[in-house]
């Protein structure tokens, strides 16, 4: 979270490329490299920044693999994406659709057909949108995230039990979170439609806006040497830190409201366990004070 790698970043990329080459030769149906921007998203970055980071990291992987002797077609088959999502339904739908558009453009600019290898997306609900207070509301958040992920074209969806922020989930908690997906699949039939949001002017327009703004951030990162160089230089950390300050202020001033925390809180809820979790978090992050966001975020 400080932007400092545990080991040489270039060495890690080289080893990742070697692993991908071995996987391509010995287990061609498996994907070895996962683009996961969860740590940045939980740090407070916006949807467009998250898209730009994802594409930039994927391009770093692709360059490392091709430089290691892997063909472009085989390199593309080694990459998959884990995209953190929130509870804003339309933003999530547009975000996932925009990522596919941007990735297709990257593939095409690299000299391959745009439809050679569509992005494989795992949409995972971010812990930053889960609340430690009134945890039952997390079931609604998970439902929104799951619906929007499927409507946005995710290949797989990852959800967390609603109690995970404050305690170890019980078997009942895990069953509830599984059934959210089952209900959406078997009762709404949303999975039977290829592109549920296709044709909606609002969604199409929002997708274009996300793609355009994300592409501009991506181009800025690339113009300065790529994601790895910017990470080592501290620029990525600065972007995350700036985004976090904006998000924290919006949460603390209720510009961004959190149901059950800053809006409609349960004033009679037993907060002892929650306060213990928050205190542990504050100590680990060297923070002082207790804002609405500290109760809302993991």
Task: For the regions a language model picked out, list residue spans one by one.
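Catalytic alpha/beta active-site cores
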Residues: 1-84, 150, 160, 292-298
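Secondary-structure transition/capping motifs at alpha-helix termini
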Residues: 25-29, 63-76, 102-117, 147-155, ...
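A glycine-rich phosphate-binding loop feature that marks nucleotide/adenosyl-phosphate handling sites
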Residues: 36-42, 75-86, 118-128, 160-167, ...
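Phosphate/diphosphate-binding loops
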Residues: 2-21, 135-138, 217-231
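Short glycine/threonine-rich loop-to-helix capping motif typified by GTGT followed
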Residues: 46-51, 86-98, 126-140, 167-177, ...
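Catalytic-core signal marking the mid-to-C-terminal active-site face
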Residues: 175-298
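Mobile "lid/hinge" segments at catalytic clefts and subdomain interfaces of large enzymes
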Residues: 29-59, 151-198, 204-214
């Amino acid at each position: 979270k400080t932007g400092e790698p545990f080991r040489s970043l270039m060495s890690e990329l080289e080893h990742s490329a070697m692993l991908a080459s071995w996987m391509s030769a010995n287990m061609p149906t498996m994907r070895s490299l996962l683009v996961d921007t969860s740590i940045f998203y939980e740090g407070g970055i916006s949807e467009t920044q998250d898209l730009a980071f994802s594409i930039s990291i994927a391009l770093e992987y692709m360059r490392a693999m091709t430089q290691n002797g892997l063909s472009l077609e085989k390199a593309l088959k080694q990459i998959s994406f884990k995209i953190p999502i929130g509870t804003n339904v339309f933003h999530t739908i547009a975000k996932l659709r925009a990522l596919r558009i941007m990735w297709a453009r990257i593939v095409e600019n690299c000299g391959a057909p745009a439809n050679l290898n569509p992005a494989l997306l795992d949409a995972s609900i971010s812990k930053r949108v889960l609340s430690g207070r009134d945890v039952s509301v997390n079931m609604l958040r998970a439902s929104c995230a799951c619906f929007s992920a499927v409507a946005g074209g995710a290949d797989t969806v990852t959800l967390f039990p609603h109690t995970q922020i404050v305690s170890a989930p019980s078997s009942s908690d895990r069953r509830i979170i599984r059934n959210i997906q089952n209900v959406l699949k078997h009762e709404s039939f949303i999975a039977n439609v290829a592109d549920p949001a296709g044709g909606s002017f609002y969604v199409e327009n929002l997708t274009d806006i996300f793609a355009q703004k994300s592409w501009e951030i991506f181009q800025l990162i690339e113009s300065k040497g790529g994601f790895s160089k910017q990470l080592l230089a501290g620029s990525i950390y600065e972007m995350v830190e700036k985004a976090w300050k904006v998000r924290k202020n919006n949460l603390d001033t209720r510009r961004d409201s959190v149901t059950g925390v800053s809006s409609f809180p349960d004033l009679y809820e037993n907060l002892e366990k929650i306060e213990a979790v928050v205190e542990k978090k504050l100590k680990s992050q060297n923070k002082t004070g207790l804002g609405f966001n500290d109760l809302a975020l993991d």
